[in-house]
């Protein structure tokens, strides 16, 4: 039993030389876990407001639950904030001039987020046959996944984070990470999050099978819009949560109707 405990301690600490280093490692992990949660939630709110008031794809100005998950979080923003948080700690003092130093740092952050956005979009297109967003109408876009316009937005958001959020988030997160109840809070969030991921991936698997059988890439937002049209046709209530679910027909029949409308 003692030997098993030692082995578990070894792997948890990832070869830490002392208990203090192990504690530091776990604290950093909790900080990143919390930042992922904050980024996912903040990104969801940002997308919610953008789609409601500014998106050309929503002329009726309805509230639309963004992303493919049910809950109020977007993992893309969570991963992006973790990367931006880590980049905010790098030493760029070798660059002369304060303004140039910050410009290079923010550009590095923006390009990093753009790369995350690109690979995330590519994974869904190649792996799931689903396109979650489409920048095809934007100038100089690459495969409709990324474009200079949104890279510029990431640059602005990186600057806002660095000057307004990062100085305060360091103290608050370190305080939270030092409290035991915080670990429970993080665990609760990830428990709900993983259940949501499982439910949403089941929907995506159905979409993937249909898309592969018909050799198409399903435009997720167009399909969501089609679901809304079917909901109106069947006189069902609009759903902000579980927006891909219909009471009268299955997801497979919804996909068939979507295919007949947009691809035939």
Q: What does each model-identified segment do?
A:
Residues 3, 10-12:
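Short hydrophobic alpha-helical segments enriched in small aliphatic residues
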Residues 8-9, 20:
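Intrinsically disordered, low-complexity segments enriched in small/polar residues
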